[in-house]
Amino acid sequence: EELDAYFADAQNQKPYLFCEYLHAMGNSCGDTEDYFQAMERHAGACGGFVWEWCNHSPYLPNSSKMGYGGDFNDTLNDGNFCADGLVTADRQIQSNLLEYKNVYRPLRATLKNGHVEFKNYLDFTDAAEAISIHYQITEDFSVVKEGQIDDLNIAPKSTALLPLRLPA
């Protein structure tokens, strides 16, 4: 909403950059797709900075557990704002990083009237150079057909419509 309002005002001619968006604390980042779609609507939207990459939770003395807040014999507090990253302090992936990765995938596919529309979000690379698609069609948990999509020659920042060929 904030981004849409900014670009609705014709006087705003400068690019828009989100500062500390997607606060990655706990089970967060569920609105990443909403931010992505908003940025897609406006050419002047140039991204943002996720807060933040990793937790800052050191190991407790003589323990394999990481601590924060009052865990270090300091005054009890609600200081868990050091545990707000996409990865833990020892760089283990958190679920919100998987959400982020999925939203910012380099190729998106949409079904359209018996075709698949592919959009290549890569800036400099043809999709065929970076991506291969292997698919399986299943019925009652058994694979009935599988194959490879080889004609992914989609220029950077372009869209292609490919026929969807399903078995009879």
Identify what each model region corresponds to.
Residues 1-117, 121-129, 134-142:
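Extended substrate-binding grooves/exosites of carbohydrate-active enzymes
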Residues 131-168:
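Intrinsically disordered, low-complexity Pro/Gly/Ser/Thr-rich segments with frequent PxxP/GP/PP motifs
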